[in-house]
Amino acid sequence: MKQRTFTMLKPDAVKRRLTGEILTRFEKRGLKVIAAKTLMISEDLAKTHYGEHSDKPFFNDLISYITSGPVFAMVLEGDDVISLVRKMVGATNPKEADIGTIRGDYGIDTGRNIVHASDSEESAQREINLFFDETEFCDYELPDEDIIYEEP
């Protein structure tokens, strides 16, 4: 089933010049980037985005970190993309993430774990709406899309 998900490369990924390398991983898996931008997240946007963690002891550090530098936000589209991206990203703690996952290969610690990926369809839609307007989406066909989404 074709889906959309929100994925964000955090300041540690952008500052370490990993954006292109990570983006390439998603594209090589057949995912389509339909919206993307580099931005500085405001404190208000950060608090809204991470609101579910507002009662956790790490919340203030998370807000400080995510607003400390640029992020690369994107909307990815593909077959069962939410589950696929979560597998590619790996465990929240890079020390527990499998080698070959983005966090396993590039993450430093739980606080600087390179990437955020939506964990459900509801989260994906909410996060996409927070960061993007419908006018920012590019709808296009990939050369192999007819094969990927061919009905059996």
From Swiss-Prot:
Asked whether the keyword Phosphoprotein is assigned, the reply is yes
Its localization reads: Cytoplasm
Q: What EC number(s) are associated with this protein in UniProt?
A: 2.7.4.6
Q: Which UniProt keywords apply?
A: ATP-binding, Cytoplasm, Kinase, Magnesium, Metal-binding, Nucleotide metabolism, Nucleotide-binding, Phosphoprotein, Transferase
InterPro entries according to UniProt = NDK-like_dom, NDK-like_dom_sf, Nucleoside_diP_kinase, Nucleoside_diP_kinase_AS
Task: Tell me the Gene3D superfamilies matching this sequence.
Answer: Nucleoside diphosphate kinase-like domain
Q: Which cofactor does it need?
A: Mg(2+)
The reaction(s) annotated as catalysed by this protein in its Swiss-Prot or TrEMBL entry are: a 2'-deoxyribonucleoside 5'-diphosphate + ATP = a 2'-deoxyribonucleoside 5'-triphosphate + ADP; a ribonucleoside 5'-diphosphate + ATP = a ribonucleoside 5'-triphosphate + ADP
Q: Which GO terms describe its biological process?
A: CTP biosynthetic process; GTP biosynthetic process; UTP biosynthetic process
CDD domains for this protein: NDPk_I (cd04413)
Which family is this protein grouped under? Belongs to the NDK family.
Q: What is this protein called?
A: Nucleoside diphosphate kinase
The species this protein belongs to is Methanosphaera stadtmanae (strain ATCC 43021 / DSM 3091 / JCM 11832 / MCB-3)
* Upper taxonomic lineage: Archaea, Methanobacteriati, Methanobacteriota, Methanomada group, Methanobacteria
